[in-house]
Design a protein with these regions (language model features):
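N-terminal leader/targeting segments and the immediately adjacent pre-domain N-terminus
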Residues: 1-65, 72, 89-93, 190, ...
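Active-site-adjacent helix/loop patches that line small-molecule binding or acyl-intermediate pockets
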Residues: 18-27, 101-104, 112-213, 249-252, ...
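Short active-site loop at a secondary-structure junction
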Residues: 38-51, 61-102, 106, 117, ...
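Active-site SXXK
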Residues: 56, 70-95, 126, 184-188, ...
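Short, well-structured active-site flanking segments
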Residues: 59-61, 86-106, 192-218, 265-272
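Active-site-proximal alpha-helical segments within enzyme catalytic domains
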Residues: 77, 180-187, 240-264, 317-333
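Active-site-proximal binding-pocket segments
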Residues: 200-201, 205-279
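Active-site Gly/Thr loop motif
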Residues: 217, 222-238, 242, 246, ...
């Protein structure tokens, strides 16, 4: 079983160079100057790799599943997990509460949420990419991702990426925007008053028994001062470098945590209701949950079950979760032009 999927992936792997190349790696080169440069580190990659498990048992694997590689926007799903830790600890009691109110109630300055447009923005708005947050985060303006198109959104803008777009009210417009997720990450770090990689390690990765090869990098300028300490904020992807570097095997553990509704070895690491909310369709963008792609109306893959959900990143990073059949498939460095075909072959395996 799954041999057809593995063979198809091997025949359609990412065509990027193995060493970082400004001409093809990342998204930053598509940005308008002066923001078309790296702010964080990038790392050489390995060949295509991946692993497929059912009920936590590995069914098939290929490549080096223990090599830690950049995950790009798959990082967003891990940032949503860290937000789940904040919910579990009572730091966030209402995801519909404005971020500014949540921070200020705890005596934390609500940097970036002070003005009339940004004050009503809630945690939910940020998690669903409907915030319309406006400003600069570590020197990069939200405008840089205005009119941005990503491959899995159902409709595409005909405007030029980075062209100034009239802002809507928070919660009324969906846009995939890496500046806004970085602002979310910064607000979450302020709430914990700890660097998020430390939170992720303590509450998720170590309890899962993950390796110590993963690392989550910030930017050269993403430090803030808090109570006399320097804390580095981390991004939700690799748009300007940085982000999560992790092995396919560790990603499998995280995927299994998701399909097991936040439970690992009898321990509830993330609230079950949080896992459910991550998979709940956004009212105005039903293909998206909390930093998670959904197969609502089979918009991502006609071949896979509708309850499937995904974490995705450029360079052919894809994690497919099927919570009904308890399937987790981690695919690294596939040719993104063939993502639909690869998922189609996987769908054939599910249907048997």
């Amino acid at each position: 079983m799954w041999s057809d999927v593995v063979e198809y992936i091997k025949a359609h792997s990412c065509r990027w160079s193995f060493e970082p190349d400004e001409g093809e790696w990342g998204i930053h080169q598509l940005d308008d100057p002066p923001h078309n440069r790296l702010l964080g580190p990038v790392f050489a990659r390995g060949p295509a790799a991946g692993v497929i498990a059912i009920d936590g048992e590995i069914q098939s694997q290929w490549g080096d599943i223990h090599r830690a590689d950049m995950t790009f926007s798959v990082t967003k799903s891990y940032l949503a997990m860290v937000a789940g830790v904040a919910v579990a600890q009572g730091l966030i009691t209402d995801i519909d509460q404005p971020v500014s109110d949540c921070l200020e109630q705890r005596g934390i300055l609500s940097h970036g949420f002070e003005d009339a447009h940004n004050r009503p923005i809630s945690w939910r708005h940020l998690l669903q990419f409907t915030s319309e947050w406006s400003g600069q985060c570590f020197g990069v303006p939200d405008q840089i991702d205005h009119y941005r198109n990503v491959s899995m959104q159902p409709s595409a803008s005909t405007k030029r990426k980075g062209e100034k777009r009239p802002l809507k009210n928070p919660g009324t417009y969906w846009e995939y925007n890496d500046v806004r997720i970085n602002q979310f990450s910064l607000a979450l770090m302020r709430l914990f008053d700890r660097e998020l990689p430390a939170v992720f390690a303590e509450h998720i990765m170590r309890p899962l028994g993950a390796s110590d090869t993963w690392h989550w990098h910030g930017y050269e300028n993403s430090y803030i001062e808090s109570n006399g300490r320097q804390l580095q904020s981390v991004p939700g992807g690799g748009h300007w470098g940085g982000g999560m570097v992790m092995s396919a095997h560790d990603q499998l553990l995280l995927g299994q945590l998701m399909v097991n509704e936040g439970v690992h070895n009898g321990q509830q690491l993330l609230p079950e209701h949080w896992i459910e909310q991550m998979q709940t369709p956004c009212d105005i963008a039903p293909w998206y949950g909390f930093f998670t792609w959904l197969n609502t109306n089979h918009v991502v893959s006609p071949s896979l079950p509708e309850e499937s959900y995904f974490a995705m990143g450029i360079g052919g990073q894809l994690i497919w979760h099927d919570p009904v059949r308890n399937i987790v498939a981690v695919m690294r460095w596939i040719d993104s032009d063939f993502t639909g075909d690869i998922l189609g072959v996987a769908g054939g395996e599910v249907k048997g």
